[in-house]
Amino acid sequence: MTSVPLLSMNLPRHVAIIMDGNGRWAQARDLPRIEGHRRGVTTVRTVTEMASELKLDALTLYCLSSENWKRPQAELDFLMHLLQQYLVEERRTIRDQNMRLRFIGRRDRLSDEVLKEIAKTQAVSENNTGTELVLAVDYGGRDELTRMTRQLAQQVRDGERSIDEITESLVDESLDTAGLPDVDLMIRTGGDIRISNYLLWQISYAELYFTPKCWPEFERDDFQAALDEFAGRQRRFGGLNVGA
């Protein structure tokens, strides 16, 4: 297994991952789709451990999109059970690895049981100072921007602020990800080359990395390869390279 060079790399502060390909991985092995999701939890453990070792500021994982509610109810029920199980089983690890848990997305469609486990894990990790582990559950970029717009519009209507106060900084502070650095590197597994309504505001200047590997087979070396690719890219943010 390749060791992780902690000091020799230009590391991203914030990595966001679209964990795609669980179902395809399972179907290719004549397994039920839910077995792909179950195996995917092992990969979650792998990348969170590595993010903690590297002392990344934040790791955001796309667990359930706001569009995923269109899936069969049995699969959705299993995903919710898997999330609960993960939070219970990994609570101590998250705490001991000095990680902080954060949840982004809607809460009104999640069960009380899921919300309770999220709250418990947030509580035991809230004073930690290491990597922030952000779980995007019932999350969609358009939904987030719509909720933020309504919130600011309500504040203007109620006289709490003026239109002139609405700036990029205020928008940033009003999103689910308030206080987090913008995404530097977005990784998508599973072979599809699209962003799927994920962190639309936050990935404005992110480097995008797509791999054909499905999420259950994404390993430490694969994460390292994405980080190596990021380290070799020139990030211009609309400007020019020095000497260009």
Curated annotation (Swiss-Prot):
Cofactor binding mode and count: Binds 2 magnesium ions per subunit.
Function field: Catalyzes the condensation of isopentenyl diphosphate (IPP) with allylic pyrophosphates generating different type of terpenoids.
Keyword Ubl conjugation annotated: no
SUPFAM superfamilies to which the protein is assigned, alphabetical: Undecaprenyl diphosphate synthase
Top class in the EC scheme: transferase
InterPro entries: UPP_synth-like, UPP_synth-like_CS, UPP_synth-like_sf
Binding annotation for substrate: 21-25, 33, 37, 65-67, 69, 71, 188, 194-196
EC number: 2.5.1.-
Domain of life: Bacteria
Active site: D20, N68 (proton acceptor)
Residues noted as binding Mg(2+) in the record, renumbered to the chain: D20, E207
MF terms (GO), sorted A to Z: magnesium ion binding; prenyltransferase activity
Subunit relationships: Homodimer.
Protein's UniProt keywords contain Secreted: no
Protein name: Isoprenyl transferase
GO biological process: polyprenol biosynthetic process
Pfam families listed in its UniProt record: Prenyltransf (PF01255)
Family from the record: Belongs to the UPP synthase family.
Cofactor(s), names only, from the UniProt record: Mg(2+)
UniProt keywords, alphabetically: Magnesium, Metal-binding, Transferase
